[in-house]
Amino acid sequence: MDPLLVIRNAEAGSADEESLERALTVLRRHTSVEVQATADPGELDGVLHRAGSRRIVVAGGDGSLHAVVSALYRRGELKDRTLGLLPLGTGNDFARSVGMPLDAEEAALALAGGTPEPMDLIVDEVGRVVVNNVHVGAGAKAAQRGARWKSRLGKAGVGKLGYPIGAAITAWNPPLLRLRVEVDGVPVVDFDEQVLQVAVGNGRSVGGGTELTPHADPGDGMLDVMVSRATGPISRFIYAARLGMGTHPSAVDVDYVRGRQVSVSGEEFWCSADGELDGPERHRSWRLERAAYSLVVPRT
């Protein structure tokens, strides 16, 4: 097994630290392991510069994986890399999509005995990458509102209530947008209809297991695009229930298509890309970059 460089978030909590130590104990039975903690993009870039030929392992959740993949992409080094992933924390949606165990020790065993598989990547019109999923509309608005409440409530030590409050406010008063969504140049929805949510998925789930694009596979060379036109109060309730079960793609007011290029334009909207908020926007586009890097996944 190649020597490993494990990159972790310097601000990880004590529970994550304990999980990581258990995983490192397993990995050190197989190879040499160095651990580096990074707190900002500058530190991460320095660690990557010194990585050499060691296999890089990301210890963290979707945000940590996004940060490392994005930095390697900017450096022009992603294509030649095989990465590993040790899921930590509570989200880990991309890990779920590729079948990585969420238990730290089991993930370390899978990493030690796994096989590299090519992974696709979403790249936007200015060259920024998305590893897992980008969505527009209700989910992004909930995240935006939740971030505001998290900031306010964090001063009282209850910042974790921010997102549920943001989601509740959005469910009561969601953004209904007039958008034109095109997939490979073909319109899926146009300005004559209101849209509740648009999702472009490389991975299946968001928010710690909600399968927003349940048929997505990050290695199949296609993007899954979901457009919800559930704009009435009752239809929104039904959509939310079906979303929880992963059956929403078959609903009459949901379009679920696949392609390699996606564009969204129209009224001002916000995007949530791998959990990072961006906006307001009038036009965004994304394309698939096939087999952009390799990731070690469990043997099947």
Question: Where would I find each of the regions flagged by the language model?
Answer:
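Short beta-strand/turn micro-motifs composed of small residues
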Residues: 7-8, 60, 229, 266
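Glycine-rich beta-strand-to-loop/alpha-helix junction loops that act as flexible
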Residues: 10, 59-61, 86-88, 202
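ATP/nucleoside-binding phosphotransfer catalytic cores, i.e., glycine-rich phosphate-binding loops
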Residues: 183-190, 211, 217-300
